[in-house]
């Protein structure tokens, strides 16, 4: 018994992958993912322009494969569940890419130890994660987001980040919410 994970756009457009229903992680819905990437492509990135990305709490790798499909230069997928990580690795082998690097790690430890910087960081923690509110602060304090980079945090509607000094916008698609953050917020967006 499976859940279908689809690639929305790019070189792997329309590719489908069967995610076992036994997985705790669920792929971001097609509706939310398509809208998120429309916003990213129209307002923030040309993913084919050497973009490096970090996918935290990567789950099924739905965002990672979408980033690779759209032309990201390098994607690191961080996931602590060994089954989920094996699934991400299998998907990347199936599409024969060398652009994605799945890493088994606890996300907060990874953030502390990582010395690389990224143009784009996506985090999709479990909505009930007790430290969810601390994620933007941890990322900005660690220095892993480039100065002109973008952080997108997926969360439930009960979480609000508007008071965060790095917050720039929030998008909601059904029950899925995305908050956007930048290291340096332009004066027009404050």
Language model: regions and residue ranges:
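Class I S-adenosyl-L-methionine-dependent methyltransferase catalytic core
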Residues: 1-190
